[in-house]
A protein has these predicted regions:
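Acidic, glycine-enriched loop/beta-strand segments at the rims
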Residues: 173, 248-252, 265-278, 291-292, ...
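Histidine-rich, glycine-flanked metal-binding segment
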Residues: 270-312
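Divalent metal-dependent hydrolysis catalytic cores, especially in the metallo-beta-lactamase
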Residues: 328-348, 363-372, 398-411, 429-431, ...
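Contiguous hydrophobic, core-forming segments of folded domains
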Residues: 66-138, 191-195, 200, 205-211, ...
Length: 664
């Protein structure tokens, strides 16, 4: 039973061996919805006969992190399955909504959405569907594709095209007997690819993908829930194969031994920039660094002319969730060479980390923080309810090679100290959200080393609000603020404030995100649609944006007091938002150099990897970024990546961006 009381334990119908017809005139079903393999709700659907055709009505309802998500969609078709009209109203995630009508008539499509009403040419082979759609609507699209002889692509209305690639078949072992499901890789319905399983008559069994808020999402037909682990493993395997194919299609433009000559070097150490610098790369490491006249380039070494460019250390993003395989490629294109994943499905996170580490796949070097939450309403499947369960989860993550534990907000407060003690015993550190029932002081006193999101810190910098009243703005001269800063300093607490994520949530919903984050304008249309549906309405947006404006100088004050501030994005626009994080830091009072250090040497030091990364110095990994501009003059120049070097392998960003659907 789902958390909303919908039962999906339906009988499994035998697969038909006949050619794929349209959906039957009368049919119904249910899909259990999961986020990070944790059941959160269900989608139900019914096909009914109407005058001259059939109607699909599908509803999904789930509860995620305290928010309800509901969506209702109707599709009207002719008896032979040709779509006539679509209506979809509700939410595609806790952050995004849809209000769409499409009517197909006489080679025209009339579309009504947030952009108004428009009429466009459309052939009879167009299918009406929005991005991040309900599963039953995808099933109608799959049957449409099968009935038309499996064309290379199906044009969609309002926009785009969908394609299906058969990846293989999986035998699913059920109590009633084995069921063979075809496994497809589907593109065009969301950013990246979706894994889909269907019987031979086009009946969808399961889908696995990133959803409209870029979380890992699974939907499984009633009766097939026991096969969730099979679907998860196969989706990871296919995703990693696609990531490796991207690596084969976008090889490095330089690797091995070479020298980069003529760039202006910002080495990240606080030393003044070096004009006309030379950096010698040998076997993936920095062999020599200095002004041109002081560095001898070994005979026979290839030389790269970087005059007019600026070199900085490879960037770190300390708050990522690589919940689909396209993420690490986008991050690398933006100059991120090290990323900390702070909450993911372990199967995917470990698979990505290992594939990148081996050189089979492209992306930043990954550090992992294993997620632990509590029930009910927790995130993921590692839900601790007892000390023994908590310790076992920490050990599992340690054995998987995780550097940290990520505590989430439903962990019972008494278990935080248990988790921290076991993590510290094993040489791991602890980061996370402050759980419900605790404040930041209690969280740190229980053993947390780091805090995600500035809001948890701001909450202890002001007096508790009166019942029914908003919290007062932070006054840095107040005793509460001074006490909080002294406490964090005493405990060496690290903060990743995630300012870009705060802006995404706060900005006015009637303004495109690209007004604030220009990278959103380069996103593929499937992703741009949900990015531009983000934000807050009216007065809520004004209040939240004002709160963000007040928070920026407070983050700078924390940094100035000596509290380590590390740059982390928490999703938003893949790749681009690390630059937005630095821009917001500078707006709050960081110098450009301080912002660069928050994304280089400070996180390297925090993660005890400053001997390997974080600055451009001999002996360290050759993780470098060449920029067509000077970020010390304008921090936004970090967006102008000319080339990125990871472990000595140099890549141009444009092919990387294109490989995951972005405009360069």
């Amino acid at each position: 039973m789902s958390v909303l009381g919908v039962i999906c334990g339906l009988a499994v119908a035998p697969a038909s061996t006949s050619p794929s017809p349209p959906a039957p005139a009368a049919d119904s079903g249910c899909f259990t919805i999961y986020k990070l393999q944790h059941e959160v709700g269900a989608e139900t659907y019914v096909w009914s006969r109407a005058a001259g055709g059939r109607t699909l009505t599908t509803r999904w309802a789930f509860r995620y992190l305290g928010s309800d998500v509901r969506l209702e969609t109707t599709l009207e078709t002719t008896d032979d399955g040709r779509p006539l009209r679509l209506r979809s109203l509700g939410q595609t995630s806790t952050l995004t909504d849809v209000d769409l009508s499409v009517e197909l008539n006489a080679a025209r499509a009339t579309v009504r959405d947030r952009g108004g009403t428009r009429t466009e040419p459309a052939s009879g082979e167009v299918f009406p569907i929005h991005h991040y759609p309900p599963v039953a609507l995808e099933e109608a699209l799959l049957r449409f594709w099968l009935a038309r002889g499996r064309p290379a692509a199906v044009p969609l209305a309002p926009a785009g095209a969908a394609s299906f690639e058969l990846r293989g078949s999986d035998t699913l072992t059920l109590a009633a007997g084995p069921v063979v499901a075809r496994r497809y890789s589907v593109s065009g319905l969301l950013w990246g690819r979706q894994s889909m399983w269907a019987t031979s008559d086009g009946r969808i069994v399961a889908v696995v993908n990133g959803d409209a808020e870029l979380d890992r999402f699974e939907a499984v037909r009633g009766g097939f829930e026991s096969q969730l682990a099979t679907f998860v493993r196969a989706a990871v395997r296919d995703g990693l194969e696609e990531l490796q194919a991207i690596a084969r299609r976008t090889p490095p433009v330089r690797q091995g031994d070479y020298a980069i000559v003529g760039a202006r070097l910002i080495d990240g150490t606080r030393a003044p920039p070096v004009d006309d610098a030379v950096v010698v790369v040998r076997a993936g490491r920095i062999a020599a660094v200095g002004p041109r006249g002081s560095v001898q380039i070994p005979k026979g070494t290839a030389v790269i002319d970087a005059r007019g460019e600026t070199m900085i250390p490879g960037l770190w993003d300390m708050h990522v969730h690589f919940e689909q395989v396209e993420w690490p490629v986008a991050q690398l294109a933006a100059g991120v060479t090290t990323a900390r994943d702070v909450g993911n499905e372990l199967e995917l996170a470990v698979g990505l980390r290992d594939a990148i580490r081996s050189g089979r796949a492209l992306g930043p070097r990954m550090l992992l923080a294993g997620l632990i939450d509590g029930a009910p309403g927790g995130l993921g499947v590692q839900l601790a309810g007892t000390p023994d369960e908590a310790r076992a989860m920490v050990r599992r993550y340690h054995d998987a090679g995780c550097e940290q534990i990520k505590v989430y907000q439903s962990v019972p407060p008494p278990l935080v100290s248990v988790i921290a003690a076991e993590a510290h015993r094993l040489g791991m550190t602890v980061t996370g959200h402050v759980p419900t029932g605790m404040n930041a002081f209690q969280f740190v006193e229980a053993g947390a080393d780091q805090i995600n999101h500035v809001g948890f810190v701001l909450a202890v910098m002001t007096p508790p609000p009166q019942p029914g009243q908003p919290r007062a703005p932070v006054d840095l001269a107040s005793s509460e603020a001074r006490r909080a800063i002294a406490f964090l300093l005493e405990h060496h607490t690290v903060l990743d404030p995630t300012l870009a994520r705060s802006e995404e949530n706060a900005h006015p919903k009637d303004s495109l995100l690209a007004v604030y984050e220009p990278g959103a304008a380069k996103a593929p249309p499937e992703l741009a649609e949900v990015l531009n549906a983000s934000g807050s309405p009216g007065d809520v947006a004004a209040r939240r944006m004002a709160g963000l404006a007040r928070a920026l100088p407070i983050v700078n004050a924390l940094r100035a007091a000596g509290i380590p501030i590390v740059a982390g994005t928490d999703l938003v626009v893949p790749g681009h938002s690390i630059a937005r994080e630095l821009e917001l830091e500078v707006r709050g009072g960081f110098t450009p150099m301080q912002a660069i250090q928050a994304a280089t040497i400070v996180p390297a030091r925090v993660m005890a990897l400053d001997g390997e990364s974080g600055t451009v110095e001999p002996g360290k990994r050759a993780d470098l970024v060449l920029l067509d501009g000077d970020p010390l003059t304008n921090i936004s120049e970090v967006r102008r990546v000319h080339a990125v070097v990871t472990g000595g392998r140099m890549f141009l960003p444009a092919p990387l961006w294109r490989s995951v659907g972005f405009a360069p």
